[in-house]
C-alpha cells in the first residue's frame, strides 16, 4: 500500500473511531484505533484516543499502556503525562501520579491542572502543607477554577481553618457553577464556628442543588 493510501485509510479509521466513541460504542472505537496502530505503530493520536476510551471505562492500567507508548515516541507530550497522572491517581498510586505531574510542571510551570492535580495526590498522602502550596500555585495561574477553589476550601476545613475555608467556598460559588458540595462545606464551617442559622441556609441551598 502506498504511503498516501495508508494515510487516507488512517484518517478514515480515526474519524470512524471518534464517531463510535461519541456514540458510546467503545469496543468499535478501540478496534479502529488498533487498526491504525497496525498500519502505523508510531501514530500517537491513535494511542492517545484509545487511552481516553479506556479511561472512560475505568480501565486505568490499560489506558496507561497507551500513554506509555506515546511517551516512548514523544516524551514531551504534556497532556499525556497529565492523563497518565490521573490514571495513577485513580489507581491510588499517589507517589507515581506526583511524578507525572512534576513532568507536566517541568514542561510548563504555568499549567494550573498540573499543580492542582499534584495537590490532590499530596492530600491523599497527608502532605497538607505541600498540597496547599500546589493549590496556591494553581489559583495564582487560574483563579476562576471553582473546583480548585473548592479543593482548597476543603483542605482548609480539614485543617480546622474554618474562616479561611468559608472565604474560599465563597470564591468557588462566585466562580460557578454552583455545586452542592461547596455549600455543604461552607455550612459545615459555619456550624463549627457556632453560626447555626447561617449554616442551615447553606445546607438548604446544597439540598436544592441536589434535586
At which residue positions do the language-model features occur?
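Alpha-helical segment of the N-proximal tetratricopeptide repeat
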Residues: 8-39, 45, 49-56
Amino acid at each position: 500500500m502506498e504511503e498516501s493510501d495508508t494515510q487516507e485509510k488512517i484518517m478514515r479509521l480515526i474519524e470512524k473511531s471518534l464517531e463510535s466513541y461519541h456514540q458510546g460504542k467503545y469496543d468499535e472505537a478501540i478496534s479502529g484505533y488498533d487498526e491504525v496502530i497496525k498500519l502505523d505503530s508510531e501514530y500517537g493520536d491513535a494511542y492517545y484516543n484509545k487511552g481516553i476510551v479506556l479511561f472512560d471505562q475505568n480501565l486505568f492500567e490499560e489506558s496507561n499502556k497507551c500513554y506509555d507508548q506515546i511517551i516512548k515516541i514523544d516524551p514531551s507530550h504534556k497532556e499525556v503525562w497529565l492523563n497518565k497522572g490521573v490514571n495513577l491517581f485513580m489507581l491510588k498510586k499517589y507517589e507515581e501520579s506526583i511524578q507525572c505531574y512534576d513532568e507536566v510542571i517541568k514542561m510548563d510551570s504555568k499549567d494550573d491542572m498540573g499543580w492542582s492535580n499534584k495537590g490532590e495526590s499530596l492530600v491523599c498522602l497527608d502532605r497538607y502543607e505541600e498540597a496547599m502550596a500546589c493549590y496556591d500555585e494553581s489559583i495564582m495561574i487560574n483563579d476562576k477554577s471553582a473546583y480548585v477553589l473548592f479543593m482548597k476550601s476543603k483542605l482548609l476545613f480539614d485543617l480546622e481553618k474554618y474562616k479561611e475555608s468559608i472565604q474560599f467556598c465563597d470564591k468557588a460559588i462566585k466562580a460557578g457553577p454552583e455545586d452542592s458540595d461547596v455549600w455543604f462545606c461552607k455550612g459545615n464551617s459555619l456550624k463549627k464556628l457556632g453560626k447555626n442559622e447561617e449554616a442551615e441556609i447553606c445546607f438548604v441551598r446544597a439540598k436544592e442543588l441536589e434535586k
